[in-house]
């Protein structure tokens, strides 16, 4: 991993609890990223923080280190009961909650603080069994948290730290009432440490969030540059008829080690998945219709490298840290400008370089001007030769068919290339 995204500030330079420093260093974390270097001095002094930084810059570790330090440095309420967690971390999606919990496990092993996880979809009794034994830090989604609270399985009266992760997404998804319901059951803002982190924070979000924070300090990293400078962007104008052929030709040319393809609807994602699966790619599908256990399995397979391509709706565009994603394809230009930033932010993370390739088809090209205005620059345009597109593609697979294994050996570059798929099939537009 590249070190160029790190600062010269060491975690050991801060007055972090020794167990936190030991846990961080045992996992190879010695130097801070910019958002960590900005946020930690504030949280260690007891100040509330609202942090804005691009995805992949270490927001999760910033609030986890702060949370563990605070709990280790401040005693629990003497009257705290078993069903009362000391810290609550709220996330907008199940996948993000699972990921935060996984990251927190790296710190919990050496600190002795117990973790709990609460998210909807499945695992109700399994999650509840952990909570019944008592947890210090509870990570979850708002719906399941409220469910447990109403059933008195958890009580928020002893909360000392609260975190809102991907806060703008929380509000955009309509969770503001749920968040306020949970906050009303916690101690007053002045009696707890409050943190809010996201890649984008609108003024509306900041105003709503500050209702639940104690004179929070606002910190940001690279606020004027909405897309990472390590991401190379590229744009094509395909016709609807050539769009799929162009995508598959680009995949042949780029041969990405690990890529995510975003489309705007679950039906479009299923169609893209079907074409790529039929063509022999090791591809996974992530939409809202995919069962929770399968979603987690697909993410694990993608992270571990047993599948190379993930086709997804924007359910996977927020917060998830999947290392070493080399390419992002916008098969559809998103309707929301912020989603473009979050999508391509899946690559070029943690000091690595990445590539973003967008297809501005007849249906979604109208979204381009607003996106370019929002990111503050035009996306470089490339042209392609229609006659050179792949033209012997198999019929797409359908989800209703018995699934064919996509986890076989990956095709090698030495395999015969089919007609119509020469490399360097494109050139920059003048």
Swiss-Prot record:
One of its GO terms (cellular component) is cytosol. Residues 245-390 form the Helicase C-terminal domain. PROSITE patterns: DEAD_ATP_HELICASE, HELICASE_ATP_BIND_1, HELICASE_CTER, Q_MOTIF. The lineage of its organism: Bacteria, Pseudomonadati, Pseudomonadota, Gammaproteobacteria, Enterobacterales. Residues 40-219 form the Helicase ATP-binding domain. Its EC number is 3.6.4.13. Its main location: cytoplasm. This is ATP-dependent RNA helicase RhlB. GO terms for molecular function: ATP binding; ATP hydrolysis activity; RNA binding; RNA helicase activity. NCBIfam families: PRK04837.1. GO terms for biological process: RNA catabolic process.
């Amino acid at each position: 991993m590249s070190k160029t995204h790190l600062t010269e500030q060491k975690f050991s330079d801060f007055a972090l609890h020794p167990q936190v420093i030991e846990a961080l260093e045992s996992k190879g974390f010695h130097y801070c990223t910019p958002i960590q270097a900005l946020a930690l001095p504030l949280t260690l002094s007891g100040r509330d923080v609202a942090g804005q930084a691009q995805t992949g810059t270490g927001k999760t570790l910033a609030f986890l280190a702060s949370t563990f330090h605070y709990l280790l440095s401040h005693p629990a309420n003497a009257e705290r009961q078993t069903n009362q967690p000391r810290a609550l971390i709220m996330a907008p999606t199940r996948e993000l909650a699972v990921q935060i919990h996984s990251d927190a496990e790296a710190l919990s092993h050496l600190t002795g603080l117990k973790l709990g996880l609460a998210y909807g979809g499945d695992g109700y009794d399994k999650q509840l069994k952990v909570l019944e034994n008592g947890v210090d830090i509870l990570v979850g989604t708002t719906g399941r948290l409220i469910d447990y609270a109403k059933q008195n399985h958890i009580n928020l009266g002893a909360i000392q730290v609260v975190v809102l992760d991907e806060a703008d997404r929380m509000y955009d998804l309509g969770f503001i009432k749920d968040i306020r319901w949970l906050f009303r059951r916690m101690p007053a803002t002045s009696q707890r440490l409050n943190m809010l982190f996201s890649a984008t924070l609108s003024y509306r979000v900041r105003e709503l969030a500050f209702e639940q924070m104690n004179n929070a300090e606002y910190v940001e990293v690279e606020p004027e540059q909405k897309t990472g400078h390590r991401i190379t962007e590229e744009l094509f104008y395909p016709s609807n008829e050539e769009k799929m052929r162009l995508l598959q030709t680009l995949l042949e040319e780029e041969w990405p080690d690990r890529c995510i393809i975003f489309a705007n609807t679950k039906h479009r994602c299923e169609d893209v998945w079907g074409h790529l699966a039929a063509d022999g790619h090791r591809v996974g599908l992530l939409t809202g219709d995919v069962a929770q256990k399968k979603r987690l399995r697909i993410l694990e397979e993608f992270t571990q490298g047993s599948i190379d391509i993930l086709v997804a709706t924007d359910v996977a565009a927020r917060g998830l840290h999947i290392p070493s994603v080399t390419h992002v394809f916008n098969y559809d230009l998103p309707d929301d400008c912020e989603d473009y930033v979050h999508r391509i932010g899946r690559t070029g993370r943690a000091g690595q370089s990445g590539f973003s390739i967008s297809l501005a088809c007849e249906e979604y090209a109208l979204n381009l001007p607003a996106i370019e205005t929002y990111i503050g620059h035009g996306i470089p345009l490339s042209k392609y030769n229609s006659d050179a597109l792949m033209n012997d593609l198999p019929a797409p697979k359908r989800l209703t068919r018995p699934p064919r294994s996509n986890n076989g050996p990956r095709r090698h570059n030495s395999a015969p290339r089919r007609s119509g798929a020469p490399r360097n099939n494109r050139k920059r537009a003048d």
